[in-house]
């Protein structure tokens, strides 16, 4: 995977995605951000959150990660984080190469707080790059590409509200830098004429928890209930206090 992103086509793809991630993540606020996948690229660099964490399956995958963030070796389908503990989760080309993409999305929903954000990028099955899947037997052409509308439906079922979606990279999947430059004009034309045919897509969703109510802590100390009088005192009050008052009134009248 990391070697492909060092090719001219991979660098072209990462440059487009990095620019979109920088714009999206700069306006998402919180404390804890998690990037799942593409550890060799710091997609969280524009995030203002103080804690950046990236997942890696093995120590070899961790070797190329950015030094400014923490790295956790784990299975993406079973994230080692408590529920409602993260404010941002980035899934970078993970759904199309995961054996359980639904479980991966459920994990993202579990670890996110209410109003937390998930940003997902994936390859578009309806672009010109789809033909490479039949002629090239290596990453990233071996994945099971998912369309943006399908992932949007999955997010809706999990309680997310999709805020925005973008398509990009309309140049054919050529490996030559010279030919990439010649086809560069398709990026401008593709955005205007056939926007949903870009090679990649990016979705931004927000986790909604409808009916949630904030409960403020009760900092006031509860007062102890007043102690009731003993039964003997109550009987004396009922039997002896009233006659005493009556006798005093009668004494005053006399």
Show the residue positions of the predicted features:
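A short glycine-rich, Lys/Arg-flanked "PGG" loop and its adjoining helix->strand segment in the class I
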Residues: 102-117
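Class I SAM-dependent methyltransferase Rossmann-like catalytic core
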Residues: 1-26
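Short alpha-helix
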Residues: 142-165
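Conserved catalytic loop of SAM-dependent methyltransferase domains
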Residues: 163-188, 196-198
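Class I SAM-dependent methyltransferase SAM/SAH-binding core
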Residues: 19, 23-79
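Conserved class I S-adenosyl-L-methionine
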Residues: 117-145
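A short acidic, Gly/Pro-enriched loop at the edge of an enzyme's catalytic core
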Residues: 77-89
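C-terminal lobe and adjacent flexible extensions of AdoMet/dcAdoMet transferase-like proteins
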Residues: 185-254
């Amino acid at each position: 995977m990391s070697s492909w992103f060092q090719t001219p086509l991979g660098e072209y793809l990462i440059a487009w995605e990095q620019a979109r991630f920088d714009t999206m993540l700069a306006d998402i606020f919180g404390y804890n951000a998690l990037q799942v996948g593409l550890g060799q690229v710091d997609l969280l660099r524009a995030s203002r959150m103080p804690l950046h964490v990236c997942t890696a399956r093995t120590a070899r995958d961790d070797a190329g990660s950015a030094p400014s963030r923490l790295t956790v070796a784990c299975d993406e389908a079973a994230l080692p984080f408590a529920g409602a503990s993260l404010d941002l989760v980035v899934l970078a080309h993970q759904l199309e190469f995961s054996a359980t993409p639904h479980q991966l999305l459920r994990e993202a929903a579990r670890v996110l707080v209410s109003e937390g954000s998930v940003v997902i990028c994936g390859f578009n099955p309806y672009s010109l790059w789809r033909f490479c899947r039949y002629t090239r037997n290596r990453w990233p052409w071996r994945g099971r590409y998912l369309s943006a509308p399908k992932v949007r439906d999955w997010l809706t079922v999990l309680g997310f509200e999709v805020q925005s979606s973008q398509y990009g990279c309309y140049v054919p999947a050529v490996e030559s830098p010279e030919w990439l430059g010649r086809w560069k004009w398709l990026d401008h034309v593709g955005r205007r004429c056939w926007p949903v045919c870009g090679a990649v897509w990016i979705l931004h969703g927000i986790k909604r928890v409808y009916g949630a109510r904030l409960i403020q802590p009760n900092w006031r100390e509860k007062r102890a209930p007043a102690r009731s009088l003993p039964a003997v005192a109550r009987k004396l009050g009922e039997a002896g206090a009233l006659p005493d008052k009556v006798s005093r009134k009668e004494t005053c009248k006399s």
